[in-house]
């Protein structure tokens, strides 16, 4: 591709944060010329459906086109814009009204912040006025698979991109067994999604992870147990408290030897054990990275140094309420991308709006959360019985989630946790869990309670300590039968 020698706005990375920044720049600077450099083969798209809705479609052809039915029944595709929204990079200089170009399948390999120059992998140099780094990261693999033979590696994949979805979707059409490694958000959502398809098509799904239950690092133990039983009910063989020690080939299949001595024969393995953050521009760009949280260190305005901002997964930012953080979630990519874009176009806003995140295990159980959600923190939970209206399906129908077209979790020091719950039943139909640090609420998790995020956001902003959480929970109206 031919590139302009100079661009006004250079956005490195083609994901949600980059897209949100582009929208924010265009809002403030109507004739902006913006170049997005993406390693992906597709124009910017949203990732959440890749582990959620795309798997629940009965229409195979639609899934191949990355189209899906929202939980509320409406059809759409994963792309933020139609293809003709973007122009070719070489056409950008001539766009007197402004324009947005995307260069796919390439990457920036070095930055020269003194002269404001970015160099692409083919040696092309592009001078920029303002630059955003929103490179996210690459999914981690495990040494046991990384060091395996080429024959084994053919049957092992990681999961992050639309291409990964297409590949895995094709694989699942011809296997008897598939195994997911990892018990966090991605691993658990994917296991449920594959379980759903497996029950229809006829393959078994295993899920293996070291924690004592699904989402064990984020949910209090009683919710972890409940979630694990929910995942099992989706047809998943959940194997907790263990890891894969060794992998060999047996009759064309993978034989996984677990630490517990158990052996599992499977046709394909998907590794979902988190993200390795891409900070490859740190050295050439003279950018500081964060040893504790990973990612590039930026200030509260998401700026790393003059003319360089960082948003999304790779941004380790300063949050005036909760301290230094790094967050890997869709809504954070939207919020931080938007903020960085506004500031690149002359704004002076600091990080204030707490991003939220959600995780749906199919259309019937889901949660939304905000702030610091970590099972090592003391928690207080208040629960009530759920009704039909308390599902992701109903929430989406009410239009309560920001898909990012317009408009996360992290670790803190491990410490003993105290869990109280005022749920009389083991059902945990719907409820709210408060995560505390020094007695103050730093995180709120809404379990099958939707549309109450503004209340939770205000609580974190206020940083108060409360005496009676049952009273506080009433603010979320978990006992009322219908949404107001």
What spans do the regions from the language model cover?
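N-terminal Rossmann-like dinucleotide/flavin-binding domain of flavoprotein oxidoreductases
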Residues: 24-125, 219-237
């Amino acid at each position: 591709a031919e590139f302009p020698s100079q661009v006004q706005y250079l956005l490195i990375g083609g994901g949600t944060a980059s897209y949100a920044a582009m929208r924010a720049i265009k809002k403030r600077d109507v004739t902006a010329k913006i170049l997005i450099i993406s390693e992906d083969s597709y124009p910017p798209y949203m990732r959440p459906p890749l582990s959620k809705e795309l798997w629940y479609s009965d229409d195979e052809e639609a899934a191949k086109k990355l189209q899906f039915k929202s939980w509320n029944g409406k059809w759409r595709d994963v792309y933020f814009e139609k293809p003709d929204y973007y122009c070719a990079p070489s056409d950008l200089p001539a766009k007197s009204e402004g324009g947005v170009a995307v260069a796919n399948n390439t990457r920036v390999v070095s930055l020269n912040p003194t002269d404001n120059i970015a160099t692409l992998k083919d040696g092309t140099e592009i001078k920029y006025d303002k630059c955003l780094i929103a490179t996210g990261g690459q999914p981690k693999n495990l040494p046991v698979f990384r060091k395996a033979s080429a024959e084994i590696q053919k049957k092992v994949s990681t999961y992050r991109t639309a291409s990964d979805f297409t590949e895995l979707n094709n694989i699942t059409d011809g296997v008897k067994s598939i195994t997911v490694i990892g018990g966090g958000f991605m691993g658990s959502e994917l296991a449920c999604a594959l379980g759903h398809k497996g029950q229809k098509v006829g393959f078994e799904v295993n899920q293996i992870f070291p924690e004592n239950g699904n989402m064990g690092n984020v949910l209090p133990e009683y919710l972890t147990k409940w979630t694990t039983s929910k995942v099992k009910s989706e047809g998943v063989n959940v194997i907790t408290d263990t890891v894969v020690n060794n992998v060999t080939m047996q009759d064309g299949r993978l034989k996984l030897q677990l630490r517990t001595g158990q052996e599992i024969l499977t046709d394909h393995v998907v590794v979902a054990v988190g993200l390795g953050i891409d900070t490859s521009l740190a050295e050439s760009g003279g950018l500081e990275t964060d040893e504790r949280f990973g990612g590039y260190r930026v200030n509260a305005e998401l700026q790393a140094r003059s003319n360089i901002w960082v948003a999304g997964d790779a941004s380790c930012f300063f949050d005036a309420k909760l301290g230094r953080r790094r967050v890997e979630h869709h809504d954070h990519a939207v919020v931080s991308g938007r903020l960085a874009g506004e500031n690149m176009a002359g704004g002076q806003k600091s990080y204030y709006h707490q991003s939220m995140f959600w995780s749906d295990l199919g259309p019937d159980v889901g949660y939304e959360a905000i702030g610091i959600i970590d099972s090592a923190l003391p928690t207080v939970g208040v629960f009530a019985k759920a009704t039909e209206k308390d599902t992701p399906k109903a929430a989406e129908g009410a239009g309560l989630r920001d898909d990012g077209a317009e408009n996360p979790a992290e670790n803190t020091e491990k410490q003993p946790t105290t869990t109280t719950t005022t749920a009389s039943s083991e059902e945990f139909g719907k409820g709210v869990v408060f995560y505390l640090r020094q007695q103050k609420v730093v995180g709120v998790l809404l379990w099958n309670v939707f549309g109450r995020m503004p209340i939770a956001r205000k609580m974190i902003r206020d940083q108060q300590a409360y005496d009676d959480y049952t009273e506080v929970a009433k603010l979320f109206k978990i006992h009322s039968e219908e949404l107001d």
